[in-house]
């Protein structure tokens, strides 16, 4: 006879098996889908809502012992002078959507594009990052080792974010409130940049959100579709920085899981996304850029995600400063006013935007989709399939300008007017789940039987 204890164990096992069988897997986020019928937002500059300054402006500086006579390791990786034999980016207008750009001797003629924090013209930079990103795109050569990737390109600055400003609190979660302001400002700025004629739009200031946080991005999606399809602009965005660097508003971005071999129908593991990088996750309209070390390895801080398309140097950056003299800089003051090296996927995005300007100048017949395809197809050191850390691999300016690529198929090209939503993941087969739960049930049943036999033998041994 089976003991009461064994019967209780058997009941528990049955409950566990039933629970495992009945509980579905955790719900995954859906990829964002553009409503093709939605109108893009009004792009007019101006604050989305009243903002207040919460800190003094900071200027990037020179870390003691630095020598700018030679090109930085990051610049040596890309070797822009070799690319200039084929293109310098002439005739291309590149929009920089970030903390603003301060013109200077290495950044002359930057066009004002407007401000979405205050009522300036966008040529104010209180953080230093926007000016540095602009320098990587189109900084002018001099008698030192620095130059932007596409010195022939023109720049227009739109200030959309700053760590020195915050929205006046109206209650609720301040992180969500800031995200709403940033997402709204970004959508308007993308439309305005496209209307100004930008052929490349650089989004260096990004927003990171937990996947389960509900922030309406419908207007942003319409803005991205409008710029990428209707206006044929290449949109390049930073993938995001995990850890202290965080997103533009100061919120840290959490890196996502890598490929899940158990989901072959979802090779980029969209189902595993826990943190969203905005606007990078708006695929396939945005070229998202991860960061590399000077040794051509993924940076520890670069945010992984199924949207990452390519990678570029994002550490030990040397670029143009937002100081009064407009000289070079390689450091930014930390909370103790000590200079820390310039790092981040924002700078990597600046490099790739410069490459996009080179490609657009050399191949004016290519649409935005084909430009992105050329940049990703000629990247090197990537895996056989795109990686969630570095995408197709390290951007290669010379290869992007010189390689002969097969003609794009119909599926490679974006529609001219009506944009289809990104495809839903393929339906999952229930067979692996049936096998797994069936195995679990069999194992638990075997444990119950073994427990019953053991209990009976012990009882017989005592007789």
Question: Language model features by range: what are they?
Answer:
Residues 363-461:
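C-terminal subdomain of the subtilisin-like protease fold in secreted/lumenal serine endopeptidases
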Residues 57-67, 190-213, 238-239:
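Short acidic, glycine-rich surface-loop motifs adjacent to enzyme active sites
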Residues 1-30, 437-456:
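Secretory targeting and sorting signals
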Residues 207-309, 316-349, 433:
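Substrate-binding/specificity loop regions of serine endopeptidase catalytic domains
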Residues 21, 25-91, 105-106:
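Protease zymogen maturation seam
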């Amino acid at each position: 006879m089976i003991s009461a204890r064994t019967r209780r164990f058997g009941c528990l096992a049955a409950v566990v098996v039933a629970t495992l069988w009945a509980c579905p897997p955790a719900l995954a986020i859906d990829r964002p889908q553009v409503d093709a019928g939605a109108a893009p937002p009004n792009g007019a500059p101006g604050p989305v809502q009243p903002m207040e300054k919460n800190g003094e402006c900071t200027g990037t500086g020179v870390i003691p012992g630095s020598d700018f006579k030679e090109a930085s390791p990051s610049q040596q990786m890309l070797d822009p002078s070799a690319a200039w034999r084929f293109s310098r980016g002439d005739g291309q207008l590149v929009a920089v959507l970030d903390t603003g750009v301060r013109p200077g001797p290495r950044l002359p003629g930057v066009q004002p594009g407007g401000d979405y924090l205050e009522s300036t013209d966008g040529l104010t930079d209180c953080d230093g990052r926007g000016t540095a990103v602009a320098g990587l795109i189109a900084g002018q050569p001099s008698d030192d080792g620095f130059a932007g990737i596409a010195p022939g390109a023109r720049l227009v600055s739109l200030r959309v974010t700053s760590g020195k400003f915050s929205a006046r609190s109206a209650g609720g979660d301040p992180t969500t409130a800031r995200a709403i302001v940033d997402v709204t400002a970004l959508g308007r700025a993308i439309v305005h940049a496209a209307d100004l004629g930008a052929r490349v739009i650089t989004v260096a200031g990004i927003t990171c959100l937990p996947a389960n946080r509900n922030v309406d991005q419908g207007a942003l999606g319409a803005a991205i579709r409008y710029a990428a399809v209707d206006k044929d602009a290449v949109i390049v965005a930073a993938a995001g920085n995990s850890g202290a660097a965080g997103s533009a508003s100061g919120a840290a971005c959490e890196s996502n899981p890598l490929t899940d071999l158990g989901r072959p129908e979802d090779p980029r593991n969209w189902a595993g996304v826990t943190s969203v990088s905005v606007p990078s996750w708006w695929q396939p309209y945005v070229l998202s850029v991860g960061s590399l070390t000077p040794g051509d390895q993924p940076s520890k801080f670069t945010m992984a995600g199924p949207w990452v398309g390519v990678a570029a140097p994002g550490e030990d950056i040397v670029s143009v400063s937002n100081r009064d003299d407009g000289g070079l800089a390689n450091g930014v003051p930390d909370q103790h006013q000590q200079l820390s090296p310039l790092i981040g996927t924002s700078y990597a995005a600046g490099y790739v935007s410069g490459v996009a300007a080179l490609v657009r100048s050399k191949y004016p017949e290519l649409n935005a989709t084909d430009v992105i395809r050329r940049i990703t197809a000629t990247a090197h050191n990537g895996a056989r399939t795109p990686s969630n850390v570095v995408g197709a691999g390290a951007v290669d300016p010379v290869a992007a300008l010189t390689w002969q690529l097969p003609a794009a198929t119909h599926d490679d090209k974006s529609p001219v007017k009506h944009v289809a939503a990104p495809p839903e993941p393929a339906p999952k087969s229930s067979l692996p789940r049936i096998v797994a739960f069936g195995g679990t049930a069999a194992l638990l049943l075997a444990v119950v039987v073994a427990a019953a036999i053991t209990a009976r033998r012990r009882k017989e041994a005592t007789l």
